[in-house]
């Protein structure tokens, strides 16, 4: 029996009184069973409540039955039937020893919940009398007066490994005092048996639908793996679908939350959160100093040569706010500011305060009013040189930005702190848009060319959809590890991120072409309703600008044509007047 039977990462927000991050904690192996049953109202799942223990932050948490692997589990795996070690190890992506996890999961389920997944030597099911005799040994097993292997031998049974299926894999984040590498299995509740708590490790149990468990998440003190698995069960819907899903999985990825701090204190961050990859980059050992918030005016050190400050201009269009990056350092302790942001005295002060040394250069990606207007104020405060490209169109631009050093793309700057900045002209979002590659970190500062969590607005005449896609494809040829966007956290897998943007734009383009199935001509209003029927009306003003960008690209490609009356039809077709879509 495990001394810590419920290996889940920390619960919700963690208070400093509970514990502090502990980098370097050893990782222990564990196994858990998600037990399901069929009820009149649908699928239900078994949750056990952890008994209270002094100093245990998991006391009272509702969990699936499970616990640590014991040394005897490796030997006990010889008493499993329906699966051999080679098959089990392959499912877990282990070289060997995989069947011990199956044995441990079934042992723990019997110890804690009184549910036994076992079969007679001839693989037949056990009858009620046999099950009652074995159940009587549960107390001795929990007292360690007997082992599971001894029970199997005494009663001539095998643990039925083929009756549970591998479902999920979770690893406690670095920094948590007790770390667990936990394999989650799933099974239907065995026949002729009733789940009961052991009144030692667990003091209560209940059957709930996944929806009920999720609704009561806080009350039940569900740990991240528990509620994430409940979400999966809810999506799949019924017992058969869950078991089929588990058995069909070829590779089960390992999910590891990461610790970070922010407005809600120290908490685990899930891999699907935008900040996850950055947290791993900034704080791989789990000291807890990385942030899951982009808080205005707070400087965050992303590397020895890189600091980020976010402006207090968050909105639907700017996301959490515009990022300003400080690049440099080294022996000279001199810095460059990239994208100083909107005209905001408090933000300019925050940039000055964040710089460990004098700011000598101010680089700008483009002259939209959330990126460059602070350049003049920051220059007045620091005497720094302005570098970038002046606005090519007056509309929606910061026309006051006049660079001391005009850039066209292709330039390289050797900055302090062994920091080499390569300038790349990337028209599309704006005609004067520049991206900057920090060569030593294989990082691209994308401005608005790539944003986290949304697609950028392509707004003609300065915005050009054809140029945008061409620029993206050119960037995909670069050797990059990270994107540093003008809005959002650091982004991993740059090629994948850019390909997703291209795919999204081309999917929308295909929808534009589909709207011309009847030939046309069509008005902008007709096309907007057909092409952006998946976009809320409140966003249709911006969608209209993107639609125009698509139409202009297709016109330049020779696919569509615009009439003098402002209608759109297929190139070469006669277009006397607007028709209905």
Residue ranges and their predicted role:
Residues 296-354, 435-447, 452:
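Conserved beta-strand hairpin/beta-sheet module of binuclear metal-dependent hydrolase folds
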Residues 211-213, 332-344, 412, 420-511, ...:
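Metallo-beta-lactamase
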Residues 315, 320, 342-422, 442:
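Active-site HxH/HxHxD metal-binding segment of metal-dependent hydrolases
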Residues 305, 351, 487, 512, ...:
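Residue-level signal for inorganic ion chemistry
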Residues 287-295, 514-581:
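C-terminal regulatory/interaction regions
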Residues 36-38, 187-189, 327-331, 415-417, ...:
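Active-site beta-strand termini and strand-to-loop segments that position acidic
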Residues 365-371, 429, 487, 550:
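Histidine-centered divalent metal-coordination motifs
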Residues 1-296, 301:
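N-terminal leader/linker segments that precede catalytic domains of diphosphate-processing enzymes
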């Amino acid at each position: 029996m495990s001394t810590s039977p419920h290996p889940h990462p920390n619960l919700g927000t963690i208070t400093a009184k509970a514990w502090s991050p502990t980098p370097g904690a050893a990782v222990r192996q564990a196994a858990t069973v998600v037990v399901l049953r069929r009820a009149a109202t649908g699928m239900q799942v078994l949750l056990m409540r952890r008994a209270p223990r002094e100093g245990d932050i998991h006391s009272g948490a509702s969990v699936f039955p499970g616990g640590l692997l014991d040394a005897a589990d490796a030997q006990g795996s010889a008493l499993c039937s329906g699966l051999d070690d080679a098959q089990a190890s392959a499912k877990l992506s282990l070289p060997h020893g995989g069947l011990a996890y199956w044995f441990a999961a079934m042992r723990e389920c019997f110890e804690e919940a009184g549910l036994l997944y076992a079969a007679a030597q001839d693989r037949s099911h056990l009858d009620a009398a046999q099950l009652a005799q074995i159940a009587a040994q549960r107390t001795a097993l929990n007292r360690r007066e007997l082992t599971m292997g001894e029970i199997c031998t005494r009663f001539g049974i095998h643990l039925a490994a083929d009756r549970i299926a591998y479902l999920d894999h979770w690893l406690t984040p670095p920094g948590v005092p007790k770390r667990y590498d936990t394999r989650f299995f799933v099974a239907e509740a065995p026949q002729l048996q009733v789940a009961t708590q052991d009144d030692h490790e667990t003091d209560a149990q209940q059957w709930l639908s996944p929806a009920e468990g999720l609704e009561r998440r806080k009350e039940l003190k569900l740990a991240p793996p528990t509620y994430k698995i409940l979400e999966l069960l809810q999506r799949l819907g019924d017992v058969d679908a869950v078991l089929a899903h588990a058995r069909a999985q070829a590779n089960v990825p390992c999910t590891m939350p990461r610790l970070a701090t922010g407005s809600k204190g120290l908490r685990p961050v899930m891999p699907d959160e935008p900040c996850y990859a950055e947290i791993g980059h900034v704080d791989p050992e789990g000291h807890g100093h990385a942030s899951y918030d982009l808080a205005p005016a707070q400087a965050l050190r992303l590397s020895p040569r890189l600091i980020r400050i976010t402006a207090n201009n968050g909105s639907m269009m700017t996301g959490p706010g515009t990022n300003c990056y400080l690049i440099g350092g080294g022996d000279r302790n001199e810095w460059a500011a990239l994208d100083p942001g909107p005209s905001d005295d408090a933000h300019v002060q925050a940039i000055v305060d964040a710089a460990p040394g004098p700011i000598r250069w101010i680089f700008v990606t483009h002259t939209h009013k959330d990126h460059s207007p602070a350049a003049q104020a920051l220059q007045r405060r620091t005497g720094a040189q302005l570098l970038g490209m002046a606005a090519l169109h007056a509309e929606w631009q910061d026309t006051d930005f006049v660079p001391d050093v005009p850039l066209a793309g292709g330039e390289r700057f050797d900055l302090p702190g062994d920091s080499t900045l390569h300038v790349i002209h990337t028209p599309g979002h704006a005609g004067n848009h520049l991206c900057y590659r920090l060569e030593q970190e294989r990082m691209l500062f994308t401005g608005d060319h790539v944003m986290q969590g949304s697609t950028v607005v392509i707004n003609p005449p300065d915005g050009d959809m054809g140029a945008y896609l061409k620029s993206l494809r050119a960037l995909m040829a670069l050797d990059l590890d990270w994107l540093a966007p003008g809005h959002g956290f650091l982004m991993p897998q740059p090629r994948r991120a850019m390909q997703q943007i291209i795919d999204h734009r081309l999917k929308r383009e295909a929808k534009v072409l589909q709207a011309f199935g009847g030939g046309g001509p069509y008005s902008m209003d007709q096309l907007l309703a057909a092409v952006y029927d998946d976009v809320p009306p409140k966003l249709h003003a911006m969608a209209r600008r993107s639609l125009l960008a698509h139409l202009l690209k297709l016109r330049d490609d020779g696919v569509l044509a615009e009439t003098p009356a402002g209608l759109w039809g297929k190139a070469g077709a006669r277009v006397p007047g607007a028709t209905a879509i």
